[in-house]
Swiss-Prot record:
Homodimer. It catalyses: L-histidinol phosphate + 2-oxoglutarate = 3-(imidazol-4-yl)-2-oxopropyl phosphate + L-glutamate. It comes from the Bacteria. This is Histidinol-phosphate aminotransferase. PANTHER family: HISTIDINOL-PHOSPHATE AMINOTRANSFERASE (PTHR42885:SF2), HISTIDINOL-PHOSPHATE AMINOTRANSFERASE-RELATED (PTHR42885). One of its GO terms (molecular function) is histidinol-phosphate transaminase activity. Keywords: Amino-acid biosynthesis, Aminotransferase, Histidine biosynthesis, Pyridoxal phosphate, Transferase. It comes from Shigella boydii serotype 4 (strain Sb227). The gene is hisC. One of its GO terms (biological process) is L-histidine biosynthetic process. The modification N6-(pyridoxal phosphate)lysine is found at residue 214. Pathway: Amino-acid biosynthesis; L-histidine biosynthesis; L-histidine from 5-phospho-alpha-D-ribose 1-diphosphate: step 7/9.
Amino acid sequence: MSIVTITDLARENVRNLTPYQSARRLGGNGDVWLNANEYPTAVEFQLTQQTLNRYPECQPKAVIENYAQYAGVKPEQVLVSRGADEGIELLIRAFCEPGKDAILYCPPTYGMYGVSAETIGVECRTVPTLDNWQLDLQGISDKLEGVKVVYVCSPNNPTGQLINPQDFRTLLELTRGKAIVVADEAYIEFCPQASLAGWLAEYPHLAILRTLSKAFALAGLRCGFTLANEEVINLLMKVIAPYPLSTPVADIAAQALSPQGIVAMRERVAQIIAERECLIAALKEIPCVEQVFDSETNYILARFKASSAVFKSLWDQGIILRDQNKQPSLSGCLRITVGTREESQRVIDALRAEQV
């Protein structure tokens, strides 16, 4: 009998899997972290729940009710999870048969859709976006056979633009009775008028992903939400872990979603948007910057001359950006999180010093 290694015992798809390269996994020794679309300063909370000897609620009532009120939906239409990333995976586990069904997404976009499907053993199909980063609806239609879940990020990470709402409607009609359409709204607080939450009554196969990681300044909390019709939520409840949120996480999330917490979040959003516009204006005047793309988020995508050299130069100065060169159609592009005014100035000064 031949000796089998631990790796040999693993599933083939896991052995072949390339893990998602998160900002933290990529590392760096910087002091200006502008690579993960986090809020630049910490928000303080006081824990009020001390019953840590007891298991938490599966779906903490205060968190669900507060989020439902904030999002303008019914509590029965809300599922809370360990970040929106868990929501991505739950939808695949609930709706896709490994080896039979597929998911579909449209690069350049968020990398976890593909990683989650590959981990589970579900086929990934991609339809690249058009030159303006809008959906290629004909391309999607041509590949829909056997697809159970379609992921669309809007505003899209890393490009920063909204998907045309009429294209969303066309996609929802194309998939009616065939597949779940998932609108990833991780950055929707920066453009709340574009949310599809009001469409849930019209489209029973629509699901929406949300998070507290961005505008709520709670990336370290790992708390996300899926908004969907009750039939979808009930199916997701069958596959979610029994205690997805710890008691401290639920405690802080409920506070962040209180009326005072919502007001504070909106103040942060206004501050970030103002800083974003200042940074965009400055970037457009810098010689090594070829193009700055419009953004509806807390980050900016820009195309640079000699982007790899620029990325390394700033990295060496402790300014950590996100390199997007490996994403389809993003050659020469770097993504810059909008930070504090001081952090923006560090970026501007460093880029102005680059030799073109």
